Amino acid sequence: MSKNQNLTKRLVISAVFIAVSIVLNELTPIKFPFGGSVTVFSMVPLALLGWTYGIKWGLVCGAVMGTLDMLIGGLGNFAWVSGIVAYIILIFADYFVAFGVMGLSGMFKNKIKNQTVAFGLGAGIACVLRFICHFISGVTIWADYTDGWVGAWIYSLTYNGGYMLPELIITVVGCCAVINIKPIMKALEK
């Protein structure tokens, strides 16, 4: 396959996986009132992109997903904050970076012998980093809705942890399952 064909294939697969991630992101058994939800494996396609094509590619694909998520359903959150700094923190912490870090899921590929463990661990760490992004957003721009800084820390920890802990578990289980589906992994690695 030529270099241009390989790039075209990578772009098409990435676009399809981002689209699948967006659709899965809308399947929300639990949706929180000020953003955030427990989804049905929506982070797995992003994690697969980071695993298959590398961290840099995965970071970009995750940031694209974050941008689309913001445009599709996250614009309502802007009504709750005011000021340019708050908008910038919201855009980066809750969308670009939070979803971008899912591309780090491939960080242990070929570094840990058991690839199921490597992918699951990478996806788990990526989800923890995503939680940290949302936590930072919570203690900075959402602090006005709590009683002081201690209240903001506890609020952000419980609110964001309330959906990110289940999301972490679902993502790790999904990644550990999908890496063992040989036809999918073989098709991606062609």
Give residue ranges: language-model regions.
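Internal alpha-helical transmembrane segments of multi-pass membrane proteins
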Residues: 110-131, 190
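Structural signal for the C-terminal ends of transmembrane alpha-helices
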Residues: 51-53, 104-112, 177-185
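Alpha-helical transmembrane segments and their cytosolic interface
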Residues: 1-18, 120, 150-190
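Hydrophobic alpha-helical transmembrane segments
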Residues: 11-16, 44, 55-63, 88-92, ...
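Juxtamembrane/transmembrane-helix interface segments of polytopic membrane transporters
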Residues: 21, 25, 69, 73, ...
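Residue-level recognition of pore/gate-forming positions within transmembrane alpha-helices
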Residues: 18-22, 65-66, 127-131
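Interfacial aromatic-anchored transmembrane helix boundaries in multi-pass membrane proteins
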Residues: 25-38, 64-106, 143
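Hydrophobic transmembrane alpha-helices
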Residues: 1-60
